[in-house]
Amino acid sequence: MSRLRNSAQLQLSKKESLGDNGGALNTTRSSRQKQGKYGFTRKCGRLVKEQRARFYIMRRCVVMLICWTDHNNNNSDHS
């Protein structure tokens, strides 16, 4: 008896989460194809942004180390 109640509650919660019109079940084929294409574009864009940020950080670190090394070498020459 409790299993029937749980399954009925589970089915009710699924219907509630999808809404009255079925939600994602009414997605047309063309909109699914667009989502796939734009999803790929978004993923690529995100990866490009991430790699650009990593490259920027690495470049800043290298410049900082070069400047720090030059500064230390200049100070040791005078001592």
From Swiss-Prot:
Chain positions covered by the region annotation Disordered: 1-37
Q: Which GO terms describe its cellular component?
A: plasma membrane
- Report whether Transmembrane shows up as a keyword of the record: yes
Q: Does the keyword Membrane apply?
A: yes
Q: Where in the cell is it found?
A: Cell membrane
Glycosites: N26, N74
Q: Which UniProt keywords apply?
A: Cell membrane, Developmental protein, Glycoprotein, Membrane, Transmembrane, Transmembrane helix
| Regions that span the bilayer | 55-71
Entry's Gene Ontology BP terms: negative regulation of cell population proliferation; shoot system development
Q: Which Pfam families does the protein's record reference?
A: DVL
This protein's membrane topology, according to the annotation, is: Single-pass membrane protein
- For the region Required for DVL/RTFL small polypeptide activity, give the residue spans: 39-70
Q: Principal localization? A: membrane
- Specify residue ranges for compositional bias: Polar residues: 1-12
What is the recorded function of this protein according to its Swiss-Prot or TrEMBL entry? Answer: Small polypeptide acting as a regulatory molecule which coordinates cellular responses required for differentiation, growth and development, probably by restricting polar cell proliferation in lateral organs and coordinating socket cell recruitment and differentiation at trichome sites.
Q: Which family does it belong to?
A: Belongs to the DVL/RTFL small polypeptides family.
Protein name, as recorded: Small polypeptide DEVIL 8
Organism of this sequence = Arabidopsis thaliana (Mouse-ear cress)
